Amino acid sequence: MEDFKYRNYYVLRVTGGQEINVALILEERIKTNNINEIFSVVVPPNIKGYVILEATGPHVVKLISSGIRHVKGVAHGLIQKEDVTKFVSKSVALPAVKEGDLVEVISGPFRGMQAQVVRVESTKNEVVLNILESSYPVQVTVPLEQVKPVKR
């Protein structure tokens, strides 16, 4: 197997909603034709209509993608590796809550209930809540994504 010095990222324009299908077809073609010039196929989760290929050159991308039904073409230019990692990495903006804050539970079995934050476990991305709307004190641990601060 050759060690290729240059690896660039190329973007395929595809029909929206068909990104996974195109990626699977590309993967199958790469395996069956034993193509060593394509190193990875990336489907960005938040961007519809595009598939990213890590390859040695645009000629390889055009060759492997020719004849696939939902491929519209190769976008002009290259994209940087930092942009690819930004598209792929999961970055969720977690609500900023601290001990003593009033929050509302937005999902799960306690959805819609008001609660007070007892403790924030930032390593686990969880909060321990005291549900205010129950007749007796109930403490529950929920993921941080399931609460939002109450605006007052």
Swiss-Prot record:
InterPro entries (alphabetical): KOW, NGN-domain, NGN-like_dom, NGN_dom_sf, Rib_uL2_dom2, Ribosomal_uL24_CS, Spt5_arc, Translation_prot_SH3-like_sf
GO cellular component: ribosome
Keywords: Transcription, Transcription regulation
Keyword Transcription: yes
Residue stretches making up the KOW domain: 99-129
GO MF, one example: translation elongation factor activity
SUPFAM superfamilies named among the record's database cross-references: Translation proteins SH3-like domain (SSF50104)
CDD domains found in the cross-reference section: KOW_NusG, NGN_Arch
One BP term from GO: regulation of DNA-templated transcription
Family affiliation: Belongs to the archaeal Spt5 family.
Subunit and partners: Heterodimer composed of Spt4 and Spt5. Interacts with RNA polymerase (RNAP).
Protein purpose: Stimulates transcription elongation.
Protein name: Transcription elongation factor Spt5
Biological classification of the source: Archaea, Thermoproteota, Thermoprotei, Sulfolobales, Sulfolobaceae
Gene responsible for this protein: spt5
